[in-house]
A protein has these predicted regions:
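Core catalytic lobe of class I
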Residues: 1-192, 196
Length: 198
């Protein structure tokens, strides 16, 4: 895909990740990991390639996150508010505010989502000053046949907040390809992994 790469493979497998990266190290891992949607959205739409159940999600996190830390300088991910406890304590938490509400939980619609950050803030590390760590976003995502597509303008904001022009982005759960599109639109390269051949 021009300067980008996409590989059909498993981001919880060290050999597959090494093959995708081919010795390069990413400046940023930006991803929207599985949410544990089996028996609901994923199963109905044949997306359950990760055995994406709540029971299995902890194992997915335990495998992909350490691998991502070996190939990327920092990691930024959107776990979904109900899955945040499955992840190790982050270095920082940014916030995505969605006034209309996203995702029905046990207490109703949640109006914000955590963005977990691991590693140093790239802007502060490069002495570029402090930048906002919250975004208010009301744009609806285009589904593209995928259950959890992120709005492209939100994803672009997150990419520009956490990386620089020309840098390399690693995406372990490519899904509908939003990270590749955002990388193309913002002048970055993206190496993406997706288990589903679709």
């Amino acid at each position: 895909l021009g300067k980008h790469r996409i590989m059909c493979g498993d981001s919880t497998d060290a050999g597959s990740v090494a093959q995708l990266m081919d010795g390069e190290k990413a400046n940023l891992c930006l991803t929207d990991p599985p949410y544990g949607l089996a028996n609901t959205v994923s199963e109905k739409n044949n997306y359950d390639f990760y055995n994406d159940s709540k029971d299995n999600l902890k194992e997915i996190v335990a495998k992909f996150l350490p691998l991502a830390q070996t190939v990327a300088e920092c990691i930024v991910l959107t776990p979904g508010i109900s899955n945040q406890s499955l992840y190790p304590a982050p270095t920082w938490i940014m916030a995505w505010f969605t006034p209309a509400g996203v995702g029905l939980g046990p207490w109703g619609f949640c109006c914000w989502q955590p963005i977990l950050c691991y590693g140093k803030d790239p802007k502060l590390a490069k002495r570029m000053g402090s930048h906002p760590d919250a975004i208010v976003h009301t744009e609806a995502s285009e589904k593209f046949g995928h259950p959890c597509t992120k709005p492209i303008n939100f994803w672009r904001w997150l990419m520009e907040r956490t990386s620089e022009f020309g840098e390399l982005i690693y995406e372990p759960f490519s899904g509908s390809g939003t990270t590749i599109i955002a990388a193309e639109q913002t002048g970055r390269r993206c190496y993406a992994m997706e288990l589903s051949p679709q």
